[in-house]
């Protein structure tokens, strides 16, 4: 009985001490001692070790340093885990293999971490010196399992028709806690709108009804405080179309819905439209208020020389056998001889570069011809100089240019003829005593020809 009473007294004293410590924690840290932690919330993975770093500092002399760790859950009293005075550690025997501390470092190591270890961890530091200083901090610890890779399934698996069917996408995860789901399309988050809605946990996406704009790559991103994983890309099957039906050709000129084709050309027409699955195409020719199908498939070849009329009307029809929708476009083919006209237009339409090149060549050739003309016809300059002389100077020049001594007249001369009357009279007066064999035609020749005859005349006179 006495032993039971002693144990009861010991329990009451320990409980009283824990209550006092808890009250001190609520009061906060004391002046001169500061305890800090990097984060007030730490997320841990079940089965792995978790380290709770703690730092403290003080500016007064200390004889003893005491560190105490407590653990509490919601609506429960704090539980003693371990403590130390200086470098001596006193653990709770129940947790001596789970919690580790190496004083004077106040950090705590939890290994291994279990779901039962989730809660608040309180660290209290006491400094004994001239007085006692105390400070504490609280750290919240959460424990989770990592997320496993999710898988996405969609229904119906065969696909849905645009504006008619609906699609449901479901994200499934086999492992993980506190899961958060997010749906993405082509890498961007999907938000709620008139056709998109989610389940309460966001693990299901409904698209009602589906449209062509809903085509894309869908993924499910699942995360929790310790990890995140994204599913493989899935692309639901959506049937739509046809949209944007149009006809093009490899030759000819297209203006609106009219194709102009040169006579003798074989033109290949192509009919295309956006749809899934691909459309089936048919070509219809209209003539004399009647229509008849001439070909099936996306291509139609028209030989212009085989067309009886110069104008022909055609229709291209596109049909989607899944959506049940169809579309058609009409066009006209005009056959004309435009080959010569094209050549004439090409000849008339010179490019600016060709025009500049032609003008440049013309200027260069003109400058070269002008240079040659000035270089090899200098008589004009001499003529202008002689015509500007007075008559007396000219006669004086004639007087002293006789042939008294023909041998001294040999040399290199440059003469100019004068076709006017004054020039003829001057030349005739100068050349008359030369020789009887010189005719009137020689008088109108150059002075170089007269000089050529003078030596022969003088030689005859000497004989």
Curated annotation (Swiss-Prot):
Membrane topology: Single-pass type I membrane protein
Location(s), subcellular: Golgi apparatus membrane; Cytoplasm, Cytoskeleton, Spindle; Cytoplasm, Cytoskeleton, Microtubule organizing center, Centrosome; Midbody
Residue stretches spanning the membrane: 353-373
Glycosylation sites: 86, 130, 166, 321
Pfam families: Ig_3
Primary localization: Golgi
Spans within the Cytoplasmic topological domain: 374-463
GO BP field: cell division; centrosome cycle
Ig-like C2-type domain: residues covered: 150-234, 236-332
Record-linked InterPro entries: HEPACAM_domain (IPR052280), Ig-like_dom (IPR007110), Ig-like_dom_sf (IPR036179), Ig-like_fold (IPR013783), Ig_sub (IPR003599), Ig_sub2 (IPR003598)
Keywords: ADP-ribosylation, Cell cycle, Cell division, Cytoplasm, Cytoskeleton, Disulfide bond, Glycoprotein, Golgi apparatus, Immunoglobulin domain, Membrane, Mitosis, Repeat, Signal, Transmembrane, Transmembrane helix
GO CC entries: centrosome; Golgi apparatus; Golgi membrane; midbody; mitotic spindle; nucleoplasm; spindle
Cystine pairings recorded for this chain: 171-220, 271-316
Mod. after translation: Poly-ADP-ribosylated (PARsylated) by tankyrase TNKS during late G2 and prophase, leading to translocation to mitotic centrosomes. N-glycosylated.
Region forming the signal peptide: 1-32
Main function: Required during prometaphase for centrosome maturation. Following poly-ADP-ribosylation (PARsylation) by TNKS, translocates from the Golgi apparatus to mitotic centrosomes and plays a key role in the formation of robust microtubules for prompt movement of chromosomes: anchors AKAP9/CG-NAP, a scaffold protein of the gamma-tubulin ring complex and promotes centrosome maturation.
PANTHER family, per database record: HEPACAM FAMILY MEMBER 2, HEPACAM FAMILY MEMBER 2-RELATED
Name of the protein in its database record: HEPACAM family member 2
Lineage: Eukaryota, Metazoa, Chordata, Craniata, Vertebrata
